[in-house]
Amino acid sequence: MLNIHNIEGKIVKEDDRYIVKDNTSLKNLIVSSTTLFPNKSTSGHKHKGQEEVYMFLTGDGYIYLDEEKLSVQAGDMVLIEDGVFHRVESGARGLYFVCVFDGKRYV
C-alpha cells in the first residue's frame, strides 16, 4: 500500500523545476510522483503505444495536450491517449501530481 502524497520509490529526476520519484514495485505499472515548483514547467514528451493517467493532488496550473491547454487543480484527473504530446506548467502555488503508466517503458 502507498500513500498518494508519498509514493516512496527512487528519485529519477531532480533540478530547479521539479522532483520526480518512481515507484517500480509492480511488474507492469509505474507509479510516479512529481513535485513541480511554483511557476515552472516540465519538458514535455509523448509515448508511442502508451497511455497515462495524471492525478493532480495539490496546487494549480495547466496541462498541455498537443495544442490544447487545460486548467488543472487539486482533484483533477487527466487521461492521456497514446501518442499525445503533454507537458505540465505550475501556477504560483506549484503542483504535486501522480501519474500511472505502463512499466514496460523501462524494459
Annotate the PLM regions.
Residues 32-48:
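Conserved short histidine dyad/triad with adjacent acidic residue
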Residues 68-82:
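Short acidic-glycine-tyrosine-enriched beta hairpin
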Residues 49-51, 56-61:
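Glycine- and acidic-residue-biased ligand/ion/polar-headgroup-sensing regions
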Residues 41-43, 78, 82-87:
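Histidine-centered metal-chelating micro-motifs
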Residues 82-107:
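Ligand-binding loop in jelly-roll beta-barrel domains
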